[in-house]
Structures are given as C-alpha cells and as structure tokens.
Amino acid sequence: MSAMDSLVARAEAISSDAERVTEAKLRKVTLPLGAGVLGLITLDNGEDHTKPNTFGPRGLLSLNAAIDAALADDEVTALGITGKPFILAAGADLTSIAGGGPDAVRTVAELGHAVFRKLGEGGKPSFGFVNGLALGGGLEVALHCDYRTVMDSAPALGLPEVMLGLIPGWGGAWLVPNLVGADKAVTLILENPLSQGRTLGGQAAFALGLADACFSGADYLEQSMLWAAGVLTGSVTVDRPEVDRGEAWDAALARAEEIVASKTGGASPAARRAVELVAAARTADLDAGFAAEDQALDDMSK
C-alpha cells in the first residue's frame, strides 16, 4: 500500500455523517486563445452562502479524486479551482474532525497537505480562482496553485487559525512567507488574527501579493480564465518580487515577537508556534515545512 493509499484509508476510517461534505465537481472548459482545456474544479457543499464550503475528511477525499481525474486526463492541459458563488472555502470542518478520535487531527493535517500539494506538483499548471470568502484552508488551497486571481469584492481572506488556538496547518505557515516575505506573513498569520480576527478584502489581498491578478465580480470567472489562457500561451507574464531572506526576515520575526507579547502577553501557545514556523520557513524546504505544520497541530491537539 502506498503512503497516499494508507492516508486515504485513515481518512475513511475517521469519516462521519457529522461532516457537511463539500464536493469537488470537475468539468472541462475550453480556454480562449487556443490555450487548451482547463480542468475546472468547483467546491460546493450544496448549501447557500450562509453555510460556507469546508474541508473534512470526505471533502478532502472528494477533492483528491477530482484532482487525480484532471491530472490523468490527457485532454486537460491545466487545472483551476474555485468555489460556489461568493465562497471558495472557510477552512477545516472542525466539528467533523473533533469526533474522529485521537489521531483525527494528525490524519486530516497530513491529508490536506497531500491533496493540496498535488495542485502545485501534479505536472500541469494550476490556477486558484478566489471568487469570494477564503479563510484558513480555503485560502491555503489557492496558495498551493501555481497562479491565483482574486475577485475584487471578495469579503474575507485570511488565516485566522491563531485566533482559534491553532496554526495554519495546510501549508500556509510555509507558503505565505516564501511567497510574499516574512513581514507580510506576520501580518497575515499573527497580527490580523490577533486584531479581533481582521481579514482582507480582495483588493487588499492582491496588494499584499497573495494573488497575481484581481478582477471585478460581474464576470470574474470569465476574466480569470482569459487571464489564465494568457499565462498558458505566454502573452501574460507573472512577475513576483524576490523574497528577502536577510535582515528583512530578522526584522519581521522581531515584530512578530512584539505582536505576540502585546496581544497575548506571551500566553498563546499557538502564536508562539506560529512564530517558530515562520522562522523555520526561511530555510526549510517544502517537505520539512509541511511536516512541521503537521507536528504542530498534532502537539496542540493533545
């Protein structure tokens, strides 16, 4: 049995009817500009906007199957992921995970990493289309993609985990500092959650560097797919600033310590662990960074 097969079996063993399952629905879309066929995955739990998409064991397994199907389809040249109207996803389904037994947190942490990273490592270009609310794992799933667009009117993007006594556990603590630098990561992972759960709107998230393009809501998905076609054909170039791993990283960690001291009095193990993860992301590779997130969540669940 492969490591992934074993992980899937563990996830199936802790699945329960308590989960409001977010299904990952795959359809093929012919892109403009002769860019090929996009395997577009839409996350949808079948509820209205008052009940956001979330990821429990079954939802992650549904996404895993959709990604695998898109990667295995020779007609599909690129992958995209978006959500039901105005919602990408609101992170983990904590209620369903809570009833899964002592190893549930570790299992779901590892499964989320294993599934999400296929978006960036599957061998086909991937696009995260952030069409609305994206919190915690809902933002992290987009961060795993090679490219991202965001709707300008998206109401709430962020990594609120520290406010909940957790850490960004599906890649965020490593991906964000390595994408936008440590200082912006400290803002997203520590300062905002500890400032009464502050989040970003779509335009602010774009300005922070979390997305490569920002489009209006009226025809957001169409504009995003046209932009993706441009990336694939080479008519659109994505430039990202180089991450400063020197003094700027040191300064960011010093600011993180000040935030933790002023906001929590040093009494938040989650905030303390988040600082350690951002510090480690400076030199850790992706595997080590994700393993550290798994371990942190496992430790905090005991």
Predicted regions and their residues:
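Amphipathic alpha-helical segments at domain termini/boundaries
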Residues: 1-42, 184-299
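Long amphipathic alpha-helix in the N-terminal Rossmann-like dinucleotide-binding domain
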Residues: 67, 298-302
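A structural preference for short, pocket-lining loop segments at secondary-structure junctions
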Residues: 36-44, 60-103, 114-131, 151-156
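Conserved catalytic cores of soluble enzyme domains
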Residues: 102-239
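A short, flexible beta-alpha/helix-coil linker loop
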Residues: 45-50, 95-97, 280-281
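Short, histidine-centered active-site or binding-site loop motifs used for metal coordination
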Residues: 43-47, 101, 161, 209, ...
